[in-house]
Amino acid sequence: NTYFGFNWMDPVVGEGKTPEERERNKKLRQAISIAMDWEEYIQIFEKGLASPAHGPLPPGLFGYREDGAAAFNPIVYEKTEDGLVRRKSIEEAKKLLAEAGYPGGRDAKTGEPLVLNLDFQAAASPSTKAMLDWYQKQFAKIGIQLDIRGTDYNRFQDKVISGNHQLFLWGWLADYPDAENFLFLLYGPNAKSKTGGSGENASNYQNPKYDELFSRMRYMDEGPDKAEAINELIKIVQEDAPWTFGYFPTSSAAFHQWVHNGKPTQVVRNHIQYLRLDPETRVKAIKEWNKPIYWPLLVFVLLSALVIIPAVALHRKRERMTARTTEEDVK
Protein backbone atom coordinates (compact mmCIF):
# COMPACT_ATOMS: atom_id res chain seq x y z
CA ASN A 1 0.00 0.00 0.00
CA THR A 2 0.98 3.65 -0.43
CA TYR A 3 0.06 6.22 2.20
CA PHE A 4 0.65 9.83 3.23
CA GLY A 5 1.80 10.05 6.85
CA PHE A 6 1.90 12.60 9.66
CA ASN A 7 4.75 12.58 12.18
CA TRP A 8 3.14 12.03 15.59
CA MET A 9 6.03 13.91 17.22
CA ASP A 10 5.39 17.10 15.23
CA PRO A 11 3.75 19.93 17.23
CA VAL A 12 1.39 20.94 14.41
CA VAL A 13 0.23 17.70 12.78
CA GLY A 14 1.25 15.25 15.50
CA GLU A 15 -0.36 14.04 18.70
CA GLY A 16 -0.24 17.26 20.68
CA LYS A 17 0.70 17.69 24.34
CA THR A 18 -2.57 18.93 25.84
CA PRO A 19 -6.15 17.73 25.34
CA GLU A 20 -6.87 20.94 23.42
CA GLU A 21 -3.86 20.46 21.13
CA ARG A 22 -4.76 16.82 20.56
CA GLU A 23 -8.25 17.73 19.42
CA ARG A 24 -7.03 20.57 17.20
CA ASN A 25 -4.31 18.49 15.58
CA LYS A 26 -6.66 15.57 15.02
CA LYS A 27 -9.18 17.77 13.21
CA LEU A 28 -6.37 19.19 11.07
CA ARG A 29 -5.32 15.67 10.06
CA GLN A 30 -8.92 14.71 9.35
CA ALA A 31 -9.44 17.82 7.20
CA ILE A 32 -6.35 16.97 5.14
CA SER A 33 -7.51 13.36 4.84
CA ILE A 34 -10.78 14.52 3.26
CA ALA A 35 -9.05 16.99 0.95
CA MET A 36 -6.65 14.36 -0.43
CA ASP A 37 -8.63 13.07 -3.41
CA TRP A 38 -7.02 9.66 -3.85
CA GLU A 39 -9.67 8.66 -6.38
CA GLU A 40 -8.35 11.39 -8.67
CA TYR A 41 -4.74 10.42 -7.97
CA ILE A 42 -5.43 6.82 -8.96
CA GLN A 43 -6.93 7.85 -12.29
CA ILE A 44 -4.07 10.24 -13.12
CA PHE A 45 -0.97 8.49 -11.83
CA GLU A 46 -1.97 4.83 -11.47
CA LYS A 47 -4.08 4.63 -14.67
CA GLY A 48 -7.00 3.41 -12.58
CA LEU A 49 -5.15 0.28 -11.42
CA ALA A 50 -5.65 0.78 -7.69
CA SER A 51 -8.38 1.21 -5.09
CA PRO A 52 -8.64 3.94 -2.43
CA ALA A 53 -7.75 2.73 1.05
CA HIS A 54 -10.20 3.24 3.92
CA GLY A 55 -7.69 1.92 6.44
CA PRO A 56 -4.33 0.17 6.67
CA LEU A 57 -5.68 -3.31 5.85
CA PRO A 58 -5.98 -4.28 2.15
CA PRO A 59 -8.83 -6.35 0.70
CA GLY A 60 -8.37 -10.10 0.62
CA LEU A 61 -6.83 -10.58 4.05
CA PHE A 62 -8.53 -12.05 7.09
CA GLY A 63 -10.23 -9.26 9.01
CA TYR A 64 -11.20 -7.27 5.94
CA ARG A 65 -14.99 -7.29 5.73
CA GLU A 66 -17.12 -5.44 3.22
CA ASP A 67 -19.46 -4.52 6.09
CA GLY A 68 -16.61 -3.61 8.44
CA ALA A 69 -14.35 -0.67 9.20
CA ALA A 70 -11.68 -1.77 6.70
CA ALA A 71 -14.07 -1.10 3.81
CA PHE A 72 -15.55 2.19 5.00
CA ASN A 73 -13.87 5.14 6.73
CA PRO A 74 -16.66 7.34 8.17
CA ILE A 75 -14.21 10.16 8.93
CA VAL A 76 -13.37 10.68 5.24
CA TYR A 77 -16.32 9.16 3.39
CA GLU A 78 -20.09 9.18 3.57
CA LYS A 79 -22.84 7.00 2.17
CA THR A 80 -25.51 8.37 -0.12
CA GLU A 81 -29.19 7.47 0.17
CA ASP A 82 -28.76 4.83 -2.53
CA GLY A 83 -25.86 3.22 -0.66
CA LEU A 84 -22.97 4.60 -2.71
CA VAL A 85 -19.76 5.60 -0.94
CA ARG A 86 -18.31 9.01 -1.74
CA ARG A 87 -15.61 11.27 -0.32
CA LYS A 88 -16.89 14.02 1.95
CA SER A 89 -17.02 17.51 0.48
CA ILE A 90 -14.30 20.13 0.61
CA GLU A 91 -16.71 22.24 2.65
CA GLU A 92 -16.66 19.55 5.33
CA ALA A 93 -12.85 19.62 5.25
CA LYS A 94 -12.83 23.42 5.58
CA LYS A 95 -15.21 23.18 8.54
CA LEU A 96 -12.85 20.79 10.32
CA LEU A 97 -9.92 23.05 9.48
CA ALA A 98 -11.70 26.01 11.08
CA GLU A 99 -12.48 23.93 14.17
CA ALA A 100 -8.78 23.06 14.31
CA GLY A 101 -8.01 26.78 14.60
CA TYR A 102 -7.13 27.51 10.97
CA PRO A 103 -10.15 29.16 9.31
CA GLY A 104 -9.40 29.68 5.64
CA GLY A 105 -5.96 28.17 6.16
CA ARG A 106 -4.78 30.85 8.61
CA ASP A 107 -3.99 30.61 12.30
CA ALA A 108 -6.96 32.11 14.14
CA LYS A 109 -4.68 33.56 16.83
CA THR A 110 -1.88 35.06 14.72
CA GLY A 111 -3.45 35.43 11.29
CA GLU A 112 -0.41 33.73 9.77
CA PRO A 113 -0.98 31.31 6.88
CA LEU A 114 -0.64 27.63 7.71
CA VAL A 115 2.45 26.24 5.97
CA LEU A 116 3.18 22.50 6.14
CA ASN A 117 6.19 20.62 4.82
CA LEU A 118 6.26 17.44 2.77
CA ASP A 119 9.58 15.69 3.29
CA PHE A 120 10.08 13.93 -0.02
CA GLN A 121 12.64 11.15 -0.49
CA ALA A 122 14.07 12.47 -3.75
CA ALA A 123 15.15 15.80 -5.16
CA ALA A 124 12.47 17.53 -7.19
CA SER A 125 12.78 16.64 -10.87
CA PRO A 126 10.71 16.77 -14.07
CA SER A 127 9.62 13.16 -13.45
CA THR A 128 8.17 13.98 -10.01
CA LYS A 129 6.95 17.53 -10.66
CA ALA A 130 3.43 16.57 -11.78
CA MET A 131 2.89 14.38 -8.72
CA LEU A 132 4.24 16.95 -6.26
CA ASP A 133 2.16 19.67 -7.91
CA TRP A 134 -0.88 17.46 -7.39
CA TYR A 135 -0.17 17.17 -3.66
CA GLN A 136 0.18 20.93 -3.35
CA LYS A 137 -3.11 21.35 -5.18
CA GLN A 138 -4.90 19.11 -2.66
CA PHE A 139 -3.73 21.22 0.27
CA ALA A 140 -4.48 24.46 -1.56
CA LYS A 141 -8.14 23.40 -1.87
CA ILE A 142 -8.56 24.10 1.84
CA GLY A 143 -6.14 27.03 1.98
CA ILE A 144 -3.01 25.28 3.26
CA GLN A 145 0.37 25.97 1.69
CA LEU A 146 2.43 22.82 1.17
CA ASP A 147 6.17 23.25 0.78
CA ILE A 148 8.22 20.42 -0.72
CA ARG A 149 11.45 19.58 1.07
CA GLY A 150 13.09 17.25 -1.43
CA THR A 151 16.27 15.43 -0.54
CA ASP A 152 18.19 12.28 -1.37
CA TYR A 153 16.93 9.03 0.13
CA ASN A 154 19.74 8.64 2.68
CA ARG A 155 19.14 12.12 4.06
CA PHE A 156 15.40 11.45 4.12
CA GLN A 157 15.96 8.31 6.18
CA ASP A 158 18.09 10.28 8.63
CA LYS A 159 15.29 12.83 9.04
CA VAL A 160 12.71 10.11 9.70
CA ILE A 161 14.95 8.29 12.19
CA SER A 162 15.65 11.54 14.06
CA GLY A 163 11.97 12.57 13.96
CA ASN A 164 12.63 15.75 11.98
CA HIS A 165 10.05 15.03 9.28
CA GLN A 166 6.54 16.50 9.23
CA LEU A 167 4.57 14.99 6.34
CA PHE A 168 5.84 12.12 4.23
CA LEU A 169 4.97 9.57 1.56
CA TRP A 170 5.60 5.95 2.36
CA GLY A 171 4.56 2.47 1.36
CA TRP A 172 4.65 -1.11 2.53
CA LEU A 173 4.99 -4.48 0.80
CA ALA A 174 3.91 -7.14 3.27
CA ASP A 175 6.22 -9.93 4.36
CA TYR A 176 3.32 -12.35 4.73
CA PRO A 177 -0.47 -12.21 4.19
CA ASP A 178 -1.69 -11.46 7.70
CA ALA A 179 -3.37 -8.39 9.16
CA GLU A 180 -0.65 -8.22 11.82
CA ASN A 181 1.92 -7.40 9.13
CA PHE A 182 -0.01 -4.26 8.20
CA LEU A 183 -1.34 -3.15 11.58
CA PHE A 184 2.11 -3.35 13.19
CA LEU A 185 3.04 -0.31 11.07
CA LEU A 186 1.10 1.77 13.62
CA TYR A 187 2.16 -0.08 16.77
CA GLY A 188 3.71 2.39 19.24
CA PRO A 189 6.75 0.31 20.30
CA ASN A 190 7.70 0.11 16.59
CA ALA A 191 8.07 3.91 16.28
CA LYS A 192 10.97 4.47 13.89
CA SER A 193 12.23 7.64 15.56
CA LYS A 194 12.21 5.95 18.99
CA THR A 195 13.89 2.70 17.96
CA GLY A 196 16.86 4.13 16.11
CA GLY A 197 15.25 3.25 12.79
CA SER A 198 14.65 -0.45 13.49
CA GLY A 199 10.86 -0.06 13.78
CA GLU A 200 8.53 0.32 10.81
CA ASN A 201 6.15 2.84 12.39
CA ALA A 202 7.39 5.84 10.38
CA SER A 203 4.58 8.04 11.73
CA ASN A 204 5.71 7.36 15.32
CA TYR A 205 2.01 6.92 16.04
CA GLN A 206 1.20 5.91 19.59
CA ASN A 207 -2.15 5.22 21.22
CA PRO A 208 -2.25 3.12 24.41
CA LYS A 209 -5.62 1.61 23.49
CA TYR A 210 -4.36 0.60 20.04
CA ASP A 211 -1.08 -0.77 21.39
CA GLU A 212 -2.79 -2.89 24.06
CA LEU A 213 -5.34 -4.33 21.63
CA PHE A 214 -2.72 -4.99 18.95
CA SER A 215 -0.46 -6.82 21.39
CA ARG A 216 -3.34 -9.24 22.07
CA MET A 217 -4.59 -9.51 18.48
CA ARG A 218 -1.24 -10.45 16.97
CA TYR A 219 -1.20 -13.84 18.71
CA MET A 220 -4.85 -14.74 18.16
CA ASP A 221 -5.91 -17.55 15.87
CA GLU A 222 -8.20 -16.59 13.01
CA GLY A 223 -11.75 -16.46 14.25
CA PRO A 224 -14.48 -14.07 15.46
CA ASP A 225 -12.37 -12.62 18.31
CA LYS A 226 -9.47 -11.74 16.03
CA ALA A 227 -11.82 -10.33 13.37
CA GLU A 228 -13.46 -8.07 15.95
CA ALA A 229 -10.09 -6.94 17.31
CA ILE A 230 -8.92 -6.02 13.80
CA ASN A 231 -12.13 -4.09 13.23
CA GLU A 232 -11.62 -2.09 16.44
CA LEU A 233 -7.97 -1.37 15.63
CA ILE A 234 -8.96 0.06 12.25
CA LYS A 235 -11.65 2.24 13.85
CA ILE A 236 -9.07 3.69 16.24
CA VAL A 237 -6.67 4.78 13.50
CA GLN A 238 -9.50 6.06 11.30
CA GLU A 239 -10.46 8.42 14.12
CA ASP A 240 -6.87 9.43 14.97
CA ALA A 241 -5.86 9.75 11.27
CA PRO A 242 -2.07 9.27 11.60
CA TRP A 243 -2.16 8.62 7.83
CA THR A 244 -4.29 9.60 4.93
CA PHE A 245 -4.60 5.98 3.95
CA GLY A 246 -3.77 6.36 0.27
CA TYR A 247 -4.44 3.42 -2.00
CA PHE A 248 -3.85 -0.27 -2.65
CA PRO A 249 -2.47 -1.12 -6.11
CA THR A 250 -4.41 -3.63 -8.17
CA SER A 251 -2.54 -6.77 -9.18
CA SER A 252 -2.53 -7.88 -12.80
CA ALA A 253 -0.77 -10.65 -14.70
CA ALA A 254 -0.93 -12.62 -17.95
CA PHE A 255 -0.49 -16.40 -18.19
CA HIS A 256 -0.35 -18.80 -21.13
CA GLN A 257 -3.16 -21.32 -21.41
CA TRP A 258 -0.88 -24.13 -20.24
CA VAL A 259 -0.18 -22.39 -16.90
CA HIS A 260 -2.64 -23.25 -14.13
CA ASN A 261 -3.08 -21.72 -10.64
CA GLY A 262 -1.61 -18.44 -11.85
CA LYS A 263 -3.11 -15.63 -9.79
CA PRO A 264 -2.05 -11.96 -9.61
CA THR A 265 -0.80 -11.02 -6.14
CA GLN A 266 0.86 -8.15 -4.29
CA VAL A 267 1.91 -10.22 -1.31
CA VAL A 268 2.97 -13.74 -2.29
CA ARG A 269 6.38 -13.60 -3.96
CA ASN A 270 7.19 -17.32 -4.00
CA HIS A 271 4.14 -18.14 -6.11
CA ILE A 272 6.10 -20.11 -8.74
CA GLN A 273 5.99 -23.21 -6.56
CA TYR A 274 2.19 -23.19 -6.79
CA LEU A 275 2.01 -23.09 -10.59
CA ARG A 276 1.07 -26.19 -12.57
CA LEU A 277 2.15 -26.58 -16.20
CA ASP A 278 0.46 -28.63 -18.92
CA PRO A 279 3.35 -29.69 -21.22
CA GLU A 280 1.09 -31.25 -23.86
CA THR A 281 -0.90 -28.04 -24.29
CA ARG A 282 2.33 -26.06 -24.44
CA VAL A 283 3.89 -28.25 -27.15
CA LYS A 284 0.66 -28.20 -29.16
CA ALA A 285 0.42 -24.41 -28.95
CA ILE A 286 4.06 -23.93 -29.94
CA LYS A 287 3.62 -26.18 -32.96
CA GLU A 288 0.51 -24.27 -33.95
CA TRP A 289 2.26 -20.92 -33.56
CA ASN A 290 5.33 -22.10 -35.51
CA LYS A 291 3.42 -23.78 -38.34
CA PRO A 292 4.76 -22.44 -41.68
CA ILE A 293 2.45 -19.95 -43.35
CA TYR A 294 3.02 -19.93 -47.08
CA TRP A 295 0.37 -17.59 -48.44
CA PRO A 296 2.35 -14.38 -47.73
CA LEU A 297 5.25 -15.82 -49.76
CA LEU A 298 2.88 -16.69 -52.61
CA VAL A 299 1.44 -13.18 -52.59
CA PHE A 300 4.97 -11.77 -52.63
CA VAL A 301 5.91 -13.93 -55.64
CA LEU A 302 2.79 -12.90 -57.55
CA LEU A 303 3.31 -9.22 -56.82
CA SER A 304 6.96 -9.51 -57.79
CA ALA A 305 5.98 -11.20 -61.05
CA LEU A 306 3.50 -8.42 -61.81
CA VAL A 307 6.32 -5.91 -61.41
CA ILE A 308 9.27 -7.83 -62.87
CA ILE A 309 7.67 -9.30 -66.04
CA PRO A 310 6.49 -5.94 -67.44
CA ALA A 311 9.84 -4.40 -66.48
CA VAL A 312 11.77 -7.11 -68.35
CA ALA A 313 9.49 -6.79 -71.38
CA LEU A 314 9.95 -3.02 -71.40
CA HIS A 315 13.71 -3.41 -71.11
CA ARG A 316 13.86 -5.83 -74.07
CA LYS A 317 11.66 -3.57 -76.15
CA ARG A 318 14.01 -0.66 -75.54
CA GLU A 319 17.01 -2.83 -76.49
CA ARG A 320 15.38 -3.77 -79.81
CA MET A 321 14.57 -0.16 -80.54
CA THR A 322 18.16 0.81 -79.77
CA ALA A 323 19.49 -1.93 -82.08
CA ARG A 324 17.30 -0.77 -85.01
CA THR A 325 18.36 2.83 -84.52
CA THR A 326 22.02 1.82 -84.56
CA GLU A 327 21.60 -0.19 -87.84
CA GLU A 328 19.91 2.75 -89.58
CA ASP A 329 22.69 5.08 -88.48
CA VAL A 330 25.30 2.70 -89.96
CA LYS A 331 23.50 2.64 -93.32
Which residues does each predicted region cover?
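Structural recognition of the beta-strand scaffold that forms the well-ordered cores
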Residues: 2-7, 34, 43, 55-56, ...
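Bilobed periplasmic-binding protein-like "clamshell/Venus-flytrap" ligand-binding domains
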Residues: 43-46, 100-122, 168-171, 219-257
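Extended ligand-binding regions for polar small-molecule ligands
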Residues: 10-43, 210-227
